[in-house]
Regions:
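N-terminal ligand-binding/catalytic initiation module
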Residues: 1-82, 87, 243-251
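Glycine-rich adenosine-cofactor-binding loop
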Residues: 6-22, 121-142
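Residues in the short beta-alpha loop(s) of Rossmann-like NAD(P)-binding domains
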Residues: 12, 76-78, 153-155, 211-213
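Active-site regions of enzymes building and remodeling cell-envelope glycoconjugates
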Residues: 23-27, 37-39, 70-71, 82-95, ...
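NAD(P)-binding Rossmann-fold cofactor-contacting core
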Residues: 24-31, 144-164
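Conserved mixed alpha/beta catalytic, RNA-binding, or beta-rich assembly cores of soluble enzyme
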Residues: 43, 55, 89-93, 102-104, ...
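Rossmann-like adenosine-cofactor binding region
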Residues: 45-54, 58-69, 162-232
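Adenosine-phosphate binding glycine-rich loop
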Residues: 86-122, 216-251
Length: 251
């Protein structure tokens, strides 16, 4: 960044770990915002639902303390105050998304184990969706011996699941067998299972929704978003730093 310093403006545990890891990469850090800052690193994601920074305060106040040519790094940076700034959005980087998906999957398994009254070995599990997180969940759960079924829309995806040793079901027909599962993990960001449909589940079925938009309806559903920063902040912080260093080197 033209010899200027990086200012870490995050307020989460992941951001604190990121600050520690940045020193391992010999990144020149600024202790406070000022004219010597070439880039600012926000939390990932960077904003709360009300548009304020997750660290607290407004992004406008933060930017007022920084040079007009500062580079803003973070996640979900589609904020109107940033329209005239150069932004590096980690959540649009494919490598970051892939590595973050694995951390998310591991966090989800940790949550599931804290609620299940049984081990994952031979536990009937349904994973809904065959995206990045769904694939990572499949690998982990299969390795732990779960009786795994993946719900996917595409014939090719279901064929891949069967080739990997998982059972597969068309998403449109998964409701027919809901009663057999003791753990359901949704990764699809759309409403797929209603409260009435979920009433068919086993009384002790653990239902965890990982999607950005809720896919399962009902009070019994555990809505789990932003897991890496909450459950594994060190791994999340390290990934943020590795992504920052990599993207800067690619410029």
């Amino acid at each position: 960044m033209d010899g200027k310093r990086l200012y870490c403006a995050g307020g989460t545990a992941a951001a604190r770990y990121a600050g520690e890891y940045l020193r391992h990469f010999y990144v020149d850090l600024a202790e406070r915002p000022g004219g010597n800052v070439g880039a600012v690193l926000l939390d990932v994601p960077s904003f709360a639902p009300d548009g304020t920074l997750r660290m607290g305060g407004s992004v406008e106040n933060l930017l007022a303390q920084l040079p007009p040519d500062v580079t803003v790094c973070g996640g979900n940076l589609d904020h109107p105050a940033l329209d005239n700034y150069r932004c590096i959005d980690f959540l649009k980087d494919a490598q970051y998304q892939a590595e973050n998906a694995y951390i998310t999957a591991e966090c989800a398994v940790e949550i599931a184990l804290s609620y299940l009254p049984m081990t994952l070995r031979q536990c009937p599990v349904l994973v809904i969706g065959w995206g990045r997180i769904g694939k990572c969940l499949g690998q982990i759960l299969h390795a732990l011996g779960a009786d795994l079924t993946v719900a996917a829309r595409k014939d090719a995806d279901r064929a891949m699941c069967r080739g990997l040793g998982y059972a597969a079901v068309d998403t449109a027909r998964m409701v027919e067998t809901l009663g057999k599962y003791r753990l359901i993990l949704n990764t699809a960001p759309e409403r797929l299972l209603t409260k009435e449909q979920l009433a068919q589940c086993h009384p002790d079925c653990v239902k965890i929704d990982l999607a950005s938009k809720t896919g399962m309806e009902g009070d019994s559903v555990i809505v789990a978003r932003g897991l890496p920063g909450v459950h594994m902040p060190e791994s999340s912080g390290r990934l943020i730093v590795e992504t920052y260093v990599r993207l800067c080197r690619e410029e």
